[in-house]
Amino acid sequence: MAQHTVYFPDAFLTQMREAMPSTLSFDDFLAACQRPLRRSIRVNTLKISVADFLQLTAPYGWTLTPIPWCEEGFWIERDNEDALPLGSTAEHLSGLFYIQEASSMLPVAALFADGNAPQRVMDVAAAPGSKTTQIAARMNNEGAILANEFSASRVKVLHANISRCGISNVALTHFDGRVFGAALPEMFDAILLDAPCSGEGVVRKDPDALKNWSPESNQEIAATQRELIDSAFHALRPGGTLVYSTCTLNREENEAVCLWLKETYPDAVEFLPLGDLFPGANKALTEEGFLHVFPQIYDCEGFFVARLRKTQAIPVLPAPKYKVGNFPFSPVKDREAGQIRQAAAGVGLNWDGNLRLWQRDKELWLFPVGIEALIGKVRFSRLGIKLAETHNKGYRWQHEAVIALASPDNVNAFELTPQEAEEWYRGRDVYPQAAPVADDVLVTFQHQPIGLAKRIGSRLKNSYPRELVRDGKLFTGNA
């Protein structure tokens, strides 16, 4: 594999020599950093089983190597990487897999280790959505996830990835993560804090990642991380699990942050060792039981993961002074909800008791029941999935609801050819050889729902959202 030139400040190299255990070779560390990062993907088991995915993609000649800490994760090699970007494959467009760095699959593996089955989870720094979607898959779209992102520009990307993967149990917020301890005390069974960090572990992906690095900036970032983990710990219920992770390598932003929390709440913090998380985990194990992953150990990005339990309650923080505002939705009455459910089933949309119907003007939404306890405590950027808009002739079903709820076995499902599916993703109407009978047609490809179309004569009118329309070369190889 080709080398690339990574910029290393001298002070960084000194710090790494001190941080690295004697069992590891510093020369191996430098060599690993110079190698480009291996590509990796995670199968979205909300859409397809791993076995079915492997069978579906077998004709492509992809080399898929299992990632030890994630049953759904694989390093991927393709003979001609430039011929078609992974993001333009049919399987990616329909949400069958997520392009995710292997080491970033570790925190969620730790969160659900030892049979942990949380019902309400918070992802404090969620964009672009790799870990939120991984959590949702582990929860099988049950329970509820609060996915927060401080950066306004990244909330849109987070929502797009959640929608593509067919996730229905997520509420999105846009806050500084330091507010949650006061705003939502003891509300979560599990919390993932993948903290903002100095990014020392990502040099294999970005050779210039350390251009603005300094020991002083590490100290400043660590101060913010301490405030974030303190807030997250307050939002965690007693008995709950907190996973703290970063993609950096210095001890100041990693072990020291966790040790600070234990010193602050000595009777409430229990470190849960991760040495048995997967075969070979002991190679990265610290004396505290954390995983400090240097890039040469598993040939991946540098990463850090700690898991801890809140063993007892801690003093609550003063209530926040901000006003949430009126919640603009109201629950749909049972009789009307039954009519809506029946109409939705007619086009192949079904949902279980984990979701409840709410209404705002002419909009119909499905919210996860597990998030209702948070209503009135925080302001949501987006909650659940938009099911439909009502109009005089019935309902205008929404694309995100189709992707999350549709059954491809519905009587009105219509399977497209590869060429027709590509036309669909380009936002064009489709002219199948044999037009379907129904007026509302659930469009599928590879037996996966990809949208809803209106039949007009022999034409299927495209309803694919404009913001998702793709140009350029797609999976049939035609530009």
From Swiss-Prot:
It comes from the Bacteria. S-adenosyl-L-methionine binds at A125, A126, A127, P128, G129, S130, K131, E149, D176, D194. The active site is at C247 (nucleophile). InterPro entries: Methyltr_RsmF_N, MeTrfase_RsmB-F_NOP2_cat, MeTrfase_RsmB-F_NOP2_dom, Nol1_Nop2_Fmu_2, Nop2p, RCMT, rRNA_ssu_MeTfrase_F, RsmB/NOL1/NOP2-like_CS. It is an enzyme of class 2 (transferase). Its EC number is 2.1.1.178. It is found in: Cytoplasm. One of its GO terms (cellular component) is cytoplasm. Its main location: cytoplasm. GO terms for biological process: rRNA base methylation. It catalyses: cytidine(1407) in 16S rRNA + S-adenosyl-L-methionine = 5-methylcytidine(1407) in 16S rRNA + S-adenosyl-L-homocysteine + H(+). Specifically methylates the cytosine at position 1407 (m5C1407) of 16S rRNA. PANTHER family: 28S RRNA (CYTOSINE(4447)-C(5))-METHYLTRANSFERASE-RELATED (PTHR22807:SF30), NOP2 YEAST -RELATED NOL1/NOP2/FMU SUN DOMAIN-CONTAINING (PTHR22807). This is Ribosomal RNA small subunit methyltransferase F.
